[in-house]
Amino acid sequence: MLPGLRRLLQAPASACLLLMLLALPLAAPSCPMLCTCYSSPPTVSCQANNFSSVPLSLPPSTQRLFLQNNLIRTLRPGTFGSNLLTLWLFSNNLSTIYPGTFRHLQALEELDLGDNRHLRSLEPDTFQGLERLQSLHLYRCQLSSLPGNIFRGLVSLQYLYLQENSLLHLQDDLFADLANLSHLFLHGNRLRLLTEHVFRGLGSLDRLLLHGNRLQGVHRAAFRGLSRLTILYLFNNSLASLPGEALADLPSLEFLRLNANPWACDCRARPLWAWFQRARVSSSDVTCATPPERQGRDLRALREADFQACPPAAPTRPGSRARGNSSSNHLYGVAEAGAPPADPSTLYRDLPAEDSRGRQGGDAPTEDDYWGGYGGEDQRGEQMCPGAACQAPPDSRGPALSAGLPSPLLCLLLLVPHHL
């Protein structure tokens, strides 16, 4: 080493300055202003900063990006790095997502776009390329329709949150590519009809929530193929009748909620009543709204004599296909004109299980067991800071890097006491 350089390095301040100069070309990308970053796993947390756009110069190694509770309006291609695994954008002002925005995020596993009240439509290829996506959140937006191929190619998707939108209709085969989907949340929309092939392809579905819609008809084959479904919520709709064949296609069903519908307990109720005589499920009450002499009674508690004047019902067996030339009203179980509307229901969760003919024994699973790992979107939407991003345990994360304090400067600060 040259004598002059040796003397320079013997001065602590000079040595630190040289260290800073040498470190600059090798320094990791800086953390965006007002954000907090972690090194392991690479995480950028920028929530609740009133950002109107995604921060520039995000570290390309970022795997988790939290941008919720900002004012972001538009998403464009090239904004996000290809290493992302988790992307939270809920509770922003999103109104436009340009085609190709997520196309190169082939590693992405979770995408939360929920609670964006200005997001009224999506392009057909919005989610193209997200073959590893497992969880997609689109709750509480203003979506009134969905393109027929919007979910095409999402072969790894397990959780789909579409509740509290303004959806009026679901196209047949909308979910055809979602063979691994286990949870589908559609409650709080404006759906009026469930068609024959609306849920085709969902062979792994475990929970289907359809309460709080405006359903008037369910096709007798609407649930065909849902052989693993255990939870079905249809309460707080406008259903006066329901084809017994529809429920007969659900051999694994354990929890059924049908309350707060204007059930007609006349001859139209016989198929549903007959299904209840054979089924072993935990069910809510099914209160009769008509005819007047049966108003207030539970449909499940009716007797064979109550249907004595009805024409003989064709026997149905679980999983059997509908035969014959039936009218559309019979296929869908549509209520007659003038049926009273459903009473408003506040029972959106944790409904009591009422089933005198249901499972026996203390070891049977309860509904709470099935919901133990589910965090409602209402609670999540209020979350200002993900705990995993804001509190980094020392054994799982590297040091937090705050924007505005380059790490080489720490060296200079540590040397200050040597000169006092």
Swiss-Prot record:
Highly expressed in brain and liver. Expressed at lower levels in kidney, mammary gland, placenta, skeletal muscle, spleen and thyroid. One of its GO terms (cellular component) is membrane raft. Residues 315-327 are annotated as: Important for interaction with MAG. It is found in: Cell membrane; Membrane raft; Cell projection, Dendrite; Perikaryon. One of its GO terms (biological process) is negative regulation of neuron projection development. Residues 261-312 form the LRRCT domain. It is a lipid-anchor; GPI-anchor. The keyword Repeat applies. Residues 47-60 form the LRRNT domain. Undergoes zinc metalloproteinase-mediated ectodomain shedding in neuroblastoma cells; is released both as a full-length ectodomain and an N-terminal fragment containing the leucine-rich repeat (LRR) region of the protein. N-glycosylated. Keywords: Cell membrane, Cell projection, Disulfide bond, Glycoprotein, GPI-anchor, Leucine-rich repeat, Lipoprotein, Membrane, Receptor, Repeat, Signal. Belongs to the Nogo receptor family. This is Reticulon-4 receptor-like 2.
